[in-house]
């Protein structure tokens, strides 16, 4: 039985040239399919991807653009062939992915984000041409596989940023052996970086927070960092930390400021440098030959559904608390977070809240 409306409402970008002035709109949701669910949204985290997409940094947009892929809400409709075990009224989270084929080798090996038929939660076309709409809205409709139950002891406003930013931080740590006895560097202590720091510490690693200046040193220590490196204030830092790291996760907004002539020298033989960076569309980096150092440089995108469940289990069992500021959703509220995100004025994530007041009164 459906308890969702025929049309959804959202706070949308109508022109990327005027992206900081979003407007409330009404729109048709995608066609409801047998394995789809509808979710009434409670809150939604604000991700850097929202800014890149809204501003046109990643290319032109299909309008109206409703961003948001760190969604927490309640299941209000289930398709006739749903088999995931979700029930009406369940609190679930949705991240950056709304669909994949679930049949290819990548999907069957828990690598859904790497499926060639992936549809992202917003600004991606389904096979029928419908352009997906995200979580700055009253409801969202998507395949049941990509809605994940949230443990009871994780508050919704803290759970939301985990669904994209959190798993983006957690996946490279999990896949690259973060744990006891390992020395792990987190480069870039922003929204994702601060979560990577908290996770790495909870996983048992010796954690080094790496930032350009010491401005975030106190915060990093409070988050659990064992060491702090300010690269601009310690010109010889790579020499000092030669042969130190098993893993460095690069969480910066851009790779152009990362000196790849220097960073590999800090790695142990067999060490891994993994970037989660998704910079502007026109960014290019040049890598010089970095010698016979036995170091790997790679990238990571999101994480599979099972990895998200493992992350939520870690957060729940360890009672981890990420640093979040809440802002009520509205045209004014979204404008505020866009402006502050663009200026870097956030410590360390935003969650849009008060959906009932904006959409359901």
PLM region descriptions:
Residues 100-187:
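NAD(P)H dinucleotide-binding glycine-rich loop of Rossmann-like/cofactor-binding domains
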Residues 272-274, 285-326:
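Rossmann-fold dehydrogenase core element
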Residues 180-189, 201-261:
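Adenosine-nucleotide cofactor-binding segment
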Residues 93, 248-249, 274:
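N-terminal Rossmann-like NAD(P) cofactor-binding module of classical short-chain dehydrogenase/reductase
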Residues 193-194:
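N-terminal Rossmann-fold NAD(P) dinucleotide-binding loop
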């Amino acid at each position: 039985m459906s308890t969702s409306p025929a049309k959804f409402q959202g706070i949308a970008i109508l022109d990327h040239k005027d992206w900081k002035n979003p407007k409330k709109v009404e729109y048709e949701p995608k066609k409801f399919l047998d394995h789809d669910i509808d979710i009434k949204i409670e809150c939604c985290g604000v991700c850097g991807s929202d800014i890149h997409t809204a501003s046109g940094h990643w290319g032109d947009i299909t309008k109206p653009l409703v961003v948001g892929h760190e969604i927490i809400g309640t299941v209000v409709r289930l398709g006739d062939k749903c088999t995931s075990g979700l029930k009406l009224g369940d609190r679930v989270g949705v991240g950056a992915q709304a669909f994949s084929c679930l049949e290819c080798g990548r999907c069957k090996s828990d690598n859904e984000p790497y499926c060639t038929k992936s549809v992202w939660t917003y600004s991606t076309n389904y096979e029928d041409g419908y352009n997906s709409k995200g979580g700055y809205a009253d409801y969202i409709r998507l395949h049941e596989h990509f809605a994940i139950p949230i443990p009871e002891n994780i508050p919704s406003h803290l759970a939301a940023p985990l669904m994209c930013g959190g798993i983006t931080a957690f996946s490279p740590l999990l896949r690259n052996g973060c744990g006891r006895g390992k020395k792990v560097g987190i480069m870039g202590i922003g929204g994702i970086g601060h979560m990577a720091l908290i996770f790495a510490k909870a996983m048992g690693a010796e954690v080094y927070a790496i930032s350009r200046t010491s401005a975030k040193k106190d915060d990093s220590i409070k988050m659990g960092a064992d060491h702090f490196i300010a690269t601009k204030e310690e010109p010889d830092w790579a020499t000092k930390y030669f042969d130190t790291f098993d893993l460095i996760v690069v969480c910066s907004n851009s790779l152009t400021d990362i000196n790849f002539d220097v960073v590999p020298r800090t790695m142990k033989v067999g060490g891994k440098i993994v970037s989660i960076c998704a910079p502007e569309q026109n960014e290019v980096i040049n890598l010089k030959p970095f010698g016979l150092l036995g170091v790997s440089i790679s990238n990571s995108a999101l994480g599979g559904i099972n990895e998200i469940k493992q992350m939520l289990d870690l957060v729940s069992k360890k009672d981890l608390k990420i640093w979040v500021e809440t802002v009520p959703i509205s045209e004014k509220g979204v404008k505020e977070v866009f402006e502050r995100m663009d200026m870097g004025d956030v410590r360390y994530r935003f969650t849009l809240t008060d959906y009932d007041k904006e959409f359901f009164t």
